[in-house]
């Protein structure tokens, strides 16, 4: 069984980036579009081509793709509830992952939390869209997900087995020199990758490293780590083509990753 996932991050409510994404989704025909944080932008930020929050929800909810998956970035803050309210939940689900998984046939997608920025609005909306918070804790009166991955990631790995080490989505990248500067990385996620050794991680957050060094991937041990952070004059994204031996959750036999606009590939063949 084959599945195609298009991964993108850091659209920041840019009208031009939304339009470019629509064109690419129409051309690539993915089964899933995975938004790896910062589809919205801080409303206090000046931006010439900013799309309104309600318009952003309308544009993204109408993408011609069977499934859309979101993880939080540091800019999903006070406008996120407005985005959710404008989303046509009766027509298509809004899958918002935070320390949880989403299963598409044989593919198990793990969505990491993002604790940078004001995260409470995100957590407040999760019950409204039918997504659960795994092992949430009370911290100074706030309901949040623990920053310690032992509270939520380890139970997911135990529950779903090796299939849960296929694709991890995390806005803040692990510490991989080729895809992000050290201050943009999350050392906790680095430790999680080193411990559980997933096949593939996809991040954003650092917009500059891919453009400055013309790189989009690196390795942390046996794990291939991608940065699909924002381009300026074009859309940066990756298409992931998975080949699975069966239709129930399992590890793929092959993953072909193609990065755009570079049009270069990496092939992952699990041992």
Show which residues each predicted segment covers.
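Active-site neighborhood of phospho(di)ester-bond hydrolases with catalytic His/Asp-centered motifs
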Residues: 7-10, 33-38, 67-74, 95-99, ...
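Active-site-proximal segments of metal-dependent phosphoesterases and phosphodiesterases across multiple
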Residues: 40, 45-53, 160-197
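A short C-terminal boundary segment appended to hydrolase-like catalytic domains
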Residues: 181, 245-271
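Core catalytic region of metal-dependent phosphoesterases/phosphodiesterases
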Residues: 15-104, 228
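Conserved beta-sheet core of the metallophosphoesterase superfamily
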Residues: 61, 67-69, 178-245
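Beta-strand-turn-beta hairpins that frame and shape the catalytic cleft
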Residues: 1-6, 101-111, 164-167, 216-225, ...
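Active-site-proximal loop/helix segment associated with metal-binding centers of metalloenzymes
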Residues: 107-177
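Acidic/histidine-rich helix-loop elements
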Residues: 6-13, 40-51, 121-141
């Amino acid at each position: 069984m084959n599945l195609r996932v298009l991964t993108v991050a850091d659209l920041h409510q840019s009208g031009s980036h939304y339009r470019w994404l629509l064109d690419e989704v129409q051309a690539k025909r993915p089964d899933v579009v995975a938004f790896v944080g910062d589809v919205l932008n801080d409303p206090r930020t000046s931006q010439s081509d900013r799309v309104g929050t309600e318009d952003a929800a309308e544009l993204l909810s109408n993408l011609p793709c069977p499934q859309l998956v979101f993880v939080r970035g540091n800019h999903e803050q006070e406008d996120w509830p407005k985005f959710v309210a404008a989303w046509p939940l009766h027509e298509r689900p809004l899958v918002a992952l935070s320390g949880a998984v989403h299963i598409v046939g044989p593919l198990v997608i793990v969505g990491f939390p993002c604790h940078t920025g004001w995260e409470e609005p995100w957590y407040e909306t999760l019950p409204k869209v039918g997504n659960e918070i795994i092992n949430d804790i009370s911290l100074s009166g706030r309901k949040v997900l623990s920053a310690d991955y032992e509270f939520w990631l380890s139970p997911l790995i135990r529950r779903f087995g090796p299939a849960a080490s296929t694709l991890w989505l995390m806005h803040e990248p692990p510490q991989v020199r080729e895809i992000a500067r050290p201050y943009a990385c999350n050392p906790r996620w680095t430790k999680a990758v080193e411990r559980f050794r997933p096949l593939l991680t996809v991040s954003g957050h650092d917009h500059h490293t891919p453009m400055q060094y013309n790189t989009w991937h690196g390795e942390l041990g046996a794990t291939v780590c991608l940065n699909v952070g924002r381009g300026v004059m074009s859309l940066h994204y990756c298409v992931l083509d998975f080949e699975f031996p069966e239709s129930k959750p399992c590890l793929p036999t092959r993953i072909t990753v193609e990065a755009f606009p570079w049009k270069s590939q990496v092939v992952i063949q699990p041992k």
